[in-house]
A protein has these predicted regions:
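Residue-level detector of alpha-helical recognition elements and their boundaries
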Residues: 28, 47-48, 69, 97
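A short, polar/charged loop-to-alpha-helix boundary motif
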Residues: 43-59
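C-terminal binding/interaction regions
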Residues: 1-21, 56, 61-101
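Short beta-strand scaffold segments in enzyme catalytic cores
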Residues: 24-34
Length: 101
């Protein structure tokens, strides 16, 4: 990861995970440089992984494109949700060890 803006997303995602106590957290940077964070939501009637949740938050804010997304915690399964909206977006996962995948 060579982009310092992506490193900021790592910080946002890991701090959101630590603060929330959720299983997953994700941080997204849109094409204008604005950032969004979200965690997974799990209940009997609703299941969103962190990718789905952060995409929902960003879309509700009126984004027109995605540059990069970082997730941490347990690995979200639905990277396709991001790639469907922004096929060229960079998507990273940060393992508990700190390794960027």
């Amino acid at each position: 990861m060579n982009n310092p803006e992506d490193a900021k997303l790592v910080t946002l995602a890991t701090s959101t995970l630590a603060r929330s106590g959720a299983e997953q957290a994700a941080a997204l940077r849109d094409s204008t440089g604005r950032t969004y964070v979200a965690v997974n939501v799990t209940s009997p009637s609703l299941n969103l992984d962190a990718f789905e949740a952060v995409l929902t938050v960003a879309l509700a804010s009126g984004i027109s494109g995605i540059e990069s997304v970082v997730a941490t915690g347990s690995r979200p399964a639905n990277v396709k949700a991001i790639k469907d909206f922004a096929p060229t977006a960079t998507v990273f996962f940060v393992a508990a060890s700190g390794e960027v995948i």
